A protein has these predicted regions:
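Bacterial Sec-dependent N-terminal signal peptides
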Residues: 1-9
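C-terminal segment of classical bacterial N-terminal signal peptides
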Residues: 13-26
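N-terminal (or domain-start) structured segment
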Residues: 27-119, 157, 165, 181-206, ...
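An extracytoplasmic/periplasmic, membrane-proximal ligand-sensing/linker region
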Residues: 33-35, 178, 182, 219, ...
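Solvent-exposed, polar/charged alpha-helical surfaces in well-ordered, non-transmembrane soluble domains
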Residues: 53, 57, 61, 82, ...
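Hinge/capping helix and adjacent helix->loop/strand transition within the periplasmic-binding protein
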Residues: 86-92, 99, 107-194, 243, ...
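C-terminal lobe and pocket-closing loops
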Residues: 128, 214-283, 311-314
């Protein structure tokens, strides 16, 4: 009898400890027991959509439930983000968003329908990829130094194409001009494809474009690569220097994608989803596929991603305020 009581006492103590520690076993028992909706706040085929569809098979295998991708595009990802913010915080609605969704929009919009810093629990920063400073083949500058020199000798004449006002490529150009104390003209397009097409055609001079979107054009000689915005050279473009190597300090910039759930989601579910996402992202075949598309897998913890998100908000808020950019 005493032995039975001792065993029961040990089990009770272990269970109590699990509750106090907030472990998934104690807090998320039975989760998930129905399909999970994964919001993508952009149209199909973009970086966030690719990231979502790359991990859903792994998540389903790990957690034993279907993960349904639901595209909710519009308002520079605000429609999908607002839908997540207003959803029940039970772990059955999550979202993959971008640097714009989770950081830039907070600094850019005067009246944003959601608050990236208050409305979400962050799960993991999934992937990141640098931008490449590219120039039209006919543009006279072929290095960063030549571009800066040309811009200073021809103030306000260099045209910077971007995928839209407030995009990471637009703000990379703004930050570049701040760092180099040079000037230029922003030419926003409705998406990166149109910007790249006009850049190749020589209608605009330079642009900071996503590595995956321009590397084939660079290798084909249709665009000139001046520098990469990452903290190291890209394996696929080993001859292209980083901006730091080109003499531009404090300008490491990555576009990135990450996962979040609504604020108030139980901590155990947050941890369970985060660990499952990290495992799915680190699957060798998934990682190889993402790398082939120009992504670097990050797969960090909720705490690391939340801290990074706050640092990114502050950084881009400083850049945007200095440039006096604001959208309604």
């Amino acid at each position: 009898m005493n032995k039975l009581m001792s065993a029961a006492a040990v089990a009770a103590a272990a269970a109590a400890g699990a509750v106090l520690l907030g472990t998934p076993a104690a807090q998320a028992a039975g989760y998930p027991d129905k399909p999970v909706t994964m919001i993508v706040p952009f149209v199909p085929g973009g970086s966030s959509d690719i990231t979502a569809r790359s991990v859903t098979p792994g998540l389903s295998k790990i957690l034993g439930q279907t993960f349904v991708v639901e595209n909710k595009p519009g308002a520079n990802s605000a429609i999908g983000a607002q839908a997540l913010a207003r959803s029940t915080p039970d772990g059955y609605t999550m979202m993959v968003g971008s640097i714009g969704t989770f950081a830039i929009n907070e600094a850019l919009y005067k009246n944003l329908s959601y608050n990236p810093s208050k409305d979400f629990e962050y799960l993991t920063q999934a992937v990141r990829n640098p931008n490449v400073l590219v120039a039209a083949p006919t543009f006279p500058a072929s290095t960063v130094a030549e571009l800066v020199d040309y811009a200073k000798k021809n103030p306000g004449k260099v045209s910077y194409a971007s995928s839209g006002t407030g995009s990471s490529d637009h703000l990379s150009a703004v930050l570049f001009r701040q760092r180099t104390q040079s000037t230029g003209v922003d030419v926003p397009y409705r998406g990166g494809g149109a910007a790249i097409a006009d850049l190749i055609g020589g209608q605009v001079n330079v642009s900071f474009q996503n590595l995956g979107a321009v590397q084939t054009h660079i290798k084909a000689g249709k665009l000139k690569a001046l520098a990469i915005t990452g903290d190291a050279r890209a394996a696929d473009l080993p001859d292209v220097p980083t901006l730091a190597e080109a003499g531009i300090k404090d300008m490491v910039v990555y576009s990135w994608q990450g996962f979040a759930v609504p604020k108030g989601t139980p901590a155990a579910i947050v941890q369970q989803l985060s660990k499952a996402l990290q495992t799915a992202l680190r699957d060798p075949q998934t990682e190889k596929t993402l790398q082939g598309l120009g992504f670097e897998v990050v797969a960090n913890t909720p705490q690391q991603f939340a801290a990074f998100q706050q640092a990114e908000v502050k950084r881009w808020k400083d850049v945007i305020q200095k440039a006096n950019i604001q959208l309604e």
